[in-house]
Amino acid sequence: MDDNEQFSQLRNVISTTASALLGIENLDKSILSSNSRYKKILSETIKNLGGDDSLVKLRKNFSNLKRQEESHDAYERYSGDDYFRNQLTDSRTTFRVLTYLSDEILKASLDDEKSNHDQGLLEFTNEEESGTKNTSSLFQGFEASLPILNERLENNDKNKYIKNSEGNDHNNNNDNNDDKNDKLFEFTNNYISSVSIDTEKISRSYSMKYLKTLSEDVLRKLNFTLIQEDVTKEEVEDLSIKLERLKERHQSACKRLETVEQDELFLENALSLIKDRMKFIQEYDLELESNDPEIEDINQNEKSYNEAKESNDLNTSQQNVEDLKPNTFVNNDKDVTVAKSEAIVSKVKTKNQKTINRLQRFYNEENRKSRKLPTTLLQSHYEPGTNIATIEKAHENGVYCMDFDMPFGTLCTAGYLDHTVNVWDLTRKVKVAEMSGHLATIQCMQLGSHYNMLITGGKDAMLKIWDINLATQLYQEDQSSIESDYNSCIHTFDSHSGGITALSFDSVHLVSASQDKTIRQWDLVNGKCIQTIDLSSVVKQNQTDIVNIPDFYSSSEPFVTGSLQCFDAALATGTRDGLVRLWDMRSGKVVRTFMGHTNAVTSLKFDSYNLISGSLDKSIRTWDLRTGSLSDLFAYDSPVYSIDFDSSNLVSAIGETSFKVYNRKDDKQWECVNSAEDTSSIYHVKYKNNYAVTGSNDGTIKAWVV
């Protein structure tokens, strides 16, 4: 064997060792098998490197070892284990480091034996004719990375020089240094192009020597480019694998965060419930005495439960043990429960009769909202359009009106032909209270933003203010013995002579609209009407065709005032003549009128810049409050029954199986659609902080991520 062949075999050995050091991250256990492909290549290399001179040199290198048996030629040993023994690591780890070959490097080694070792990747031959495609070797990849490494080292030296020259001024120019570092990072991660060829000079040249020299230079650069391509492809594949792993970890962390936030919301609700219960007991003096039969019954149940748990009796089933668990809400003695509930009602009545003005007493720190939004909202982990909660058959005849205070907070709903208000916990998706008192269908409602209160307006021409905390506490008692038409209602406004169709309130004043063609302003502290606006001379019947609202939703004709909103001294109203009016509540006069709708206005809302209204004319219009002009218009195939919006999104319900969403920032429209099994139509939608709640004509309530 001549020197060139021996040099080629030695290069293979060096290449395999270096590849093991660089590719240990993707080590495969199959490399350790006795019939591995690598073992065959290594044996072939050793055989080709045989000869007396090689063995003599090898034995001389081992002559300084302590033990004589370790100085034997490693190639003559039967197992080869001693060759991989050292004082730093075990033999298995050493074997992995020294013998690993990836499939790519192995293929490169085999192809390299068949190809010209010195000409690089490309030759003046057709790859299809040769049947093989050359790939870059480890040495070529190292050679191709040298220009990038040199540039990086030079830039690092420049960066150190800049930092040292700045000295004490480094802190003052911290922002400038950050910009320089960002640019440096961007530069070192970019591909360094080596293409600088004058194509015009080639077209004008007649020198074969020049063209031949240039051809060799172009071939070298093309080889370099292909090597860079191989290296970059491997880097991209490696990054793709890492990104996939990071994505899996991200999904796992999101699921864990969802569980933690659900526990956080549940515990906050439980803490709020405990505090409200304590306030309720203290306010009405309902604390149990030490000899109260309920305490004795609880202690007895606790004792029986512990005895059953400790006895390990084989005849006691798990269900029997569960039946013995203490229950602080349900008493086994029905007579005692009824008597206790009647006693509680009696105390509540007495307490309320002693109070001169229950409405004034309500506005205190105890009734302020204590719940706050979690730091990271759950809906941020869901895709937009996801239905995250469903309450089926919340009402028998369809949802007529509703409102909620915050995502995963409290939801209040009323159904068509239903005289009661249901209160729901959106976190647990359960009903926590029920408030009765209206004599007809409840047509509008609004939850307080600062106090745990709800104001409702009904077809019975009455407005009622409800104490949500008190209603929740009384709902825990035996419903058969408690008259609920008075206890959780703080105050009733009864000056209207027609059904209440719309209401709005802020911290001080309440404004309501009625079918008696009046708008009244109320003082929420003393409960008195302080202003009345007559609409009989302003609102006239629209001459266009009237689109009737479905029977479950309304009467045979639209409301005189379909919607209103007040803020401070400003009031906006939408009426059945299709006009949207802005009022000054201090003077009771119209200051601006928005004309454009051709049918009754069903809903509206305004912020600091825009007023948006929906109408039975199948359109939504956006008005500029500063100029009074129309700034946007949306047309649909069905009448618009409900809208809501914030600075990000506008949502609307048009009586279809989906509700519409318009992204105000990206100027895009999309929709949240019911499942294929749910054919109910959505007529009501409320929206806050990317969280929407919808009500359908079959009584279903759903929560969505928007």
UniProtKB/Swiss-Prot annotation:
WD repeats lie at residues 394-434, 437-476, 495-534, 554-593, 596-635, 637-672, 677-706. It is found in: Mitochondrion outer membrane. GO terms for cellular component: COPI vesicle coat; mitochondrial outer membrane. Residues 160-181, 305-328 are annotated as: Disordered. The keyword Membrane applies. InterPro entries: Coatomer_complex_subunit, G-protein_beta_WD-40_rep, WD40/YVTN_repeat-like_dom_sf, WD40_repeat_CS, WD40_repeat_dom_sf, WD40_rpt. Gene3D superfamilies: 6.10.280.220, YVTN repeat-like/Quinoprotein amine dehydrogenase. One of its GO terms (molecular function) is ubiquitin binding. It holds the Pfam family WD40. Residues 227-264 form a coiled coil. One of its GO terms (biological process) is intracellular protein transport. It is a peripheral membrane protein. Keywords: Coiled coil, Membrane, Mitochondrion, Mitochondrion outer membrane, Repeat, WD repeat. Belongs to the WD repeat MDV1/CAF4 family. Involved in mitochondrial fission. Has a partially redundant function to CAF4 in acting as an adapter protein required to form mitochondrial fission complexes. Formation of these complexes is required to promote constriction and fission of the mitochondrial compartment at a late step in mitochondrial division. This is Mitochondrial division protein 1. It comes from Vanderwaltozyma polyspora (strain ATCC 22028 / DSM 70294 / BCRC 21397 / CBS 2163 / NBRC 10782 / NRRL Y-8283 / UCD 57-17) (Kluyveromyces polysporus). The lineage of its organism: Eukaryota, Fungi, Dikarya, Ascomycota, Saccharomycotina.
